[in-house]
Amino acid sequence: MSLTRRQFAKANAAAIAATVAGMPIASTASNLVTEADATNLKWDKAPCRFCGTGCGVMVATRENRVVATHGDVKADVNRGINCVKGYFLSKIMYGTDRLTQPLLRMKDGKFDKQGEFQPVTWDQAFDIMEEKYKAALKAGGPEAIGMFGSGQWTIWEGYAANKLMKAGFRSNNIDPNARHCMASAAFGFMRTFGMDEPMGCYEDIEAADAFVLWGSNMAEMHPVLWTRLTDRRLSAPHVKVAVMSTFEHRSFELADIPMIFNPQTDLVILNYIANHIIQSGAVNKEFIDKHTRFAKGATNIGYGLRPTDPLELKAENAAVANTWTDIGYEDYVEFLKPYTLEHAAKESGVPAERLKALAELYADPKVKVMSFWTMGFNQHTRGVWANNMIYNIHLLTGKISEPGNSPFSLTGQPSACGTAREVGTFSHRLPADMAVTNPKHRAITEKIWKLPEGTIQEKPGFHAVDQSRKLKDGVLKVYWTQVTNNMQAGPNVMQEILPGWRNPETFVIVSDVYPTVSAQAADLILPSAMWVEKEGAYGNAERRTQFWHQLVTAPGEARSDLWQLVEFSKRFRVDEVWPAELLSKAPEFKDKTLFDVLFKNGQVDRFSNDEIAEGYANYEAEAFGFYLQKGLFEEYAEFGRGHAHDLAAFDVYHRERGLRWPVVDEKETQWRYREGYDPYVEAGSGVQFYGNADKKAIIFALPYEVPAEVPDEEYPFWLSTGRVLEHWHTGSMTQRVDELHKAVPDALVYMHPEDARKLNVRRGSVVKIVSRRGEMQGRVETRGRNKPPMGLVYVPFFDANKLINKVTLDATDPISKQTDFKKCAVKIEVVSIA
């Protein structure tokens, strides 16, 4: 039997994924049913439920149940391949502890913060929520309520939540868990280009001559893209791969230039590369003269800790962290002079010859370079700077916005781009890159939403880490989370998160599908529908918007987050939540509910249920009497059309395997800012960074600054946290798939063998990781897939029984407010010897 190259790649990827997960190939076969005629299954397309790659899958249903999935061969992203998590998508929905009814803490038949969870009806759940919301609004105004959402919200769920909070309740205290993963990338894009999200696409992989991974373990975190990268590397001998990290991981297996650097010194390396480009005469002077300008960013900006922290008191520019002053090219050249090869090698610990080889990849005009990064860059107290500095390198050489030359920020959630960033569910944002602080943007939003002037507040709300602090301090009284598990995923759990959730003055609601750590710490649990139990849309890392139909119904009384948000809006009259002065501008709203004003407003409700594709259910449309998803999407699309965020018409996406915005005349855009690809670039200009008023990108002069916390005599180790291939984020879905759980049942403490010997422990010994904030126990691993250098330990955060985030520090980037989960100081105590 002969195989085509694609068939071989698919078979090989399946073999690798199965081997990594510790299972035989045969065990994957039950999830790879492909002959519909022989099985009497109904197959439909959907994007994968996991990471931001946006793989397409085919979903098989029978008797109102998902029974199988396989990679979609028609999907451009993955071309029929799935990673090991994707192969088990059909099993994530049917854990034995699936939530199927609302649960309220009760004692003696009524709510009690110290009571036990008891089943209640949806009406009872909304009754207590209504009571708590109205009391909080009366006592503290809009600032007293908050919402924490997700990059796993569908586009219309995030859009509905944004409307309900920012317009309905007039509170900007809504933030997504993407604050923990993508905020630094978003601010980096906005500062450099004036627009968010990558300019390139996945086709860059097949066109590049070199790949540089900055703090990204693509082999495990984006394995399908890694398959494409590996194919490019192995099929083209001239292609090089450079991998940089603070510890060795599986992506190093393909590295031509492997580099382990000291934590935080990626900033030094980035400036060295820029300096090398200039000193070696490799600057594309024509490009930078025409398309860039230079600026010096504010420095000594602090670490996003509480204002009373000594580090914040020393920070001179914490209040103006996101500011800069214009400088010239020669000023930038002078700024970079201290960042020599010798200095970079000394600070980073990377051998000089490897640093120079890396710099030469960027400097060589004949080499097309694709830079990839994710959490190693973004979860960083200077993450925005790191993003700006990688753009500096691509701009200095002109290696940008063309096939193969691409700085590419990878995303970790299926709609961190499509929902958190594009919809604007951050506490400071509005749709299509607009901001609550901009009067023009607020006016545009109020016009599209048909609301009176002054409805939207101008002050940004509390960001994710600050929400936890405000709950603890009693400022936030009511808090609703959806599709997120912050009690496990957030930093400094014991000191800053748990106290706020269990504060007697607060009321916390968690909408989820399983009893997560967060759900168990809440006061009210709402059972949610998941994935294909509802009609949905995600936006992936390459700006690709993808739709799916509802394919099955949710179990029991579980309801979609969209239904929960919209149904709850019926509980409030406008005159109950808006001040009289605002209501006087729209007297016709008096006695109307937030549902009437936000969702039954003549445009969201303008599409009838007759427009739902034949053969598909839609619970929300049936409940509200109109095609809610289509109405929300078409209203949302008004923000971007004509403003370089164009989306196609709703029905187009149900036909296509996704389209990359801007979509003009139903034609997607692969490379932004480049003439011939991007319809917004003016003829004859070649390249235009039109997000900024002068249509130029900014090259930033930004220095190295030390981390918030470093090892010392008492706490001599670095701690870095992250993920593993088999589990996704907090493991609330993947831990319920037997094959994945058995493959990796526990979070291990990855340690250098020499450090283990010094502690008199060995592989399998139990140790305690202790920081100034908390502690966690785990088994030592000295021979596993992750190989830290001496002085650093690595622990994944998927394990709900081993909460490593009890140990982490809640320091954030002062600009993006994104948490640094990669660097804090710990000590290791021996519990038992294996």
From Swiss-Prot:
Domain 4Fe-4S Mo/W bis-MGD-type: 41-97
Main location: periplasm
Signal peptide: 1-29
Gene3D superfamilies hit by this protein: 2.40.40.20, 3.30.200.210, 3.40.50.740, Dimethylsulfoxide Reductase, domain 2
Reactions mediated catalytically: 2 Fe(II)-[cytochrome] + nitrate + 2 H(+) = 2 Fe(III)-[cytochrome] + nitrite + H2O
Keyword field contains Metal-binding: yes
PTM comment text: Predicted to be exported by the Tat system. The position of the signal peptide cleavage has not been experimentally proven.
Name by which UniProt lists this protein: Periplasmic nitrate reductase
Gene Ontology biological process terms in this record: cellular respiration; Mo-molybdopterin cofactor biosynthetic process; nitrate assimilation
Cofactor(s) listed: [4Fe-4S] cluster; Mo-bis(molybdopterin guanine dinucleotide)
Residues given in the record as Mo-bis(molybdopterin guanine dinucleotide) binding sites: 85, 152, 177, 181, 214-221, 245-249, 264-266, 375, 379, 485, 511-512, 534, 561, 721-730, 805, 822
CDD domains assigned to the protein according to its UniProt record, in alphabetical order: MopB_CT_Nitrate-R-NapA-like, MopB_Nitrate-R-NapA-like
Subunit (UniProt): Component of the periplasmic nitrate reductase NapAB complex composed of NapA and NapB.
Sites where the protein binds [4Fe-4S] cluster: C48, C51, C55, C83
Subcellular location per the Swiss-Prot or TrEMBL entry: Periplasm
InterPro entries, sorted: Asp_de-COase-like_dom_sf, CT_Nitrate-R-NapA-like, MoPterin_dinucl-bd_dom, Mopterin_OxRdtase, Mopterin_OxRdtase_4Fe-4S_dom, MopterinOxRdtase_cofactor_BS, Periplasm_NO3_reductase_lsu, Prok_molybdopt-oxidoreductase
Residues noted as binding substrate in the record, renumbered to the chain: F797
Sample GO molecular function, one term: 4 iron, 4 sulfur cluster binding
